[in-house]
Amino acid sequence: MTTIGPIENEIKELLTKELNPINLEIINESYMHNVPKGSESHFKVKIVSEKFETLSMIEQHRLVNEILKNFIGNGKIHALSITSRTPTQWKKNNQTKINVDDDKSPSCKGGFGK
């Protein structure tokens, strides 16, 4: 079992407070990159919220980015991948979780000495 770090925990708190998600998955993908062990720099967010119902996908992503701007702007988060759904879209696919395999992140291609 992985430990939830302070940045991941704060991301969860902010998104929960602002978007009241039906489903929220936050995946720390930092281990896939050339960063020190235990880093919290690369995240994938999968979120289902009623607040997305009238928004296009790009507007949904902009909203998530706006909520997390203090992490992105100050360099706490180096990379953020977002998968967002409305409850209607989520129920249409009969899902209880957003499938992790639907949008696998690529392996790190850069970094120090790679």
Curated annotation (Swiss-Prot):
One of its GO terms (cellular component) is mitochondrion. It comes from the Eukaryota. Residues 88-98 have a biased composition (Polar residues). InterPro entries: BolA (IPR002634), BolA-like_sf (IPR036065), BolA/IbaG_stress_morph_reg (IPR050961). Pfam families: BolA. Residues 88-114 are annotated as: Disordered. Belongs to the BolA/IbaG family. This is BolA-like protein DDB_G0274169. It comes from Dictyostelium discoideum. The lineage of its organism: Eukaryota, Amoebozoa, Evosea, Eumycetozoa, Dictyostelia.
